[in-house]
Design a protein with these regions (language model features):
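Phosphate-binding/switch loop-helix module in NTP-utilizing enzymes
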Residues: 155-182
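Short, small-residue-biased leader/transition segments that mark boundaries at the very start
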Residues: 4-6
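OB-fold/S1-family single-stranded nucleic acid-binding modules
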Residues: 18-45
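Phosphate-binding glycine-rich loops and their immediate beta-loop-alpha structural context
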Residues: 54-159
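Loop/turn positions that initiate beta-strands
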Residues: 8-12, 84
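Conserved ASCE P-loop NTPase core motifs with emphasis on AAA+ ATPases
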Residues: 45-57
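Conserved glycine-centered beta->alpha loop in an early N-terminal alpha/beta scaffold
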Residues: 12-14, 18
Length: 182
């Protein structure tokens, strides 16, 4: 008998594949070993994002860290960030938004090890993507990007996939931060 497991947009499915034959374009997935890092049976226990209750931020994310920048201390004092909060950095070009974003990412990794961090880079230069991928690394970090040479439809599709990915992780009771640079 074969077990059937379902996956949704945003799930990362791992498993064993069958070697493709000459007429096939893709290899077939023979056996699913994990969905989002969990055993496939865990997927049936996960919550449905649409049925979850939104709440106001009630747990703070500390940005100051040893060896970090003064900017993160200022964020903690002037504009503290809480889990579940949305925020925006607005500034003219070349004012340091990407540098601030990297500082925030490093602080989240250092001070909130349970957080899953997704960094979404839209309409960026490939060099900036490489810089962030090298600067921000970890087992709970995903850097997703759509460079400036991609079509706007691709930017939109990548953005929607990141939101769905975050939803799937939240359904598994994981805390997720999306940092968007566009």
């Amino acid at each position: 008998s074969s077990d059937v497991c379902s996956s949704d947009l945003g799930d990362i499915v791992q498993g064993n594949i069958r070697i493709k034959t000459q007429g096939e374009k893709f290899s077939a997935l023979l056996y699913v070993t994990s969905i989002n890092g969990f055993h496939p049976s865990e997927g049936q226990k996960r919550y449905n994002f649409e049925n979850m209750t939104p709440i106001f931020p009630n747990e703070r994310l500390i940005m100051e860290r040893p060896g970090g920048t003064t900017a993160m201390r200022i964020v903690d004092l002037i504009s503290p960030i809480g889990k579940g909060q949305r925020g925006m950095i607005v500034s003219p070009p070349k004012a340091g938004k990407t540098t601030l974003l990297k500082d925030v990412a490093k602080s989240i990794l250092r001070n909130n090890k349970e957080m899953h961090l997704i960094i979404l880079l839209i309409d960026e230069r490939p060099e900036e993507v490489t810089d962030i991928k090298e600067a921000i690394q970890g087992s709970n970090v995903e850097v997703i990007y759509s460079t400036f040479d991609e079509l706007p439809e691709h930017h939109k599709r990548v953005s929607e996939m990141v939101v769905e990915r975050a939803r799937r992780l939240v359904e598994h009771k994981q805390d997720v931060v999306i940092l968007l640079d566009s």
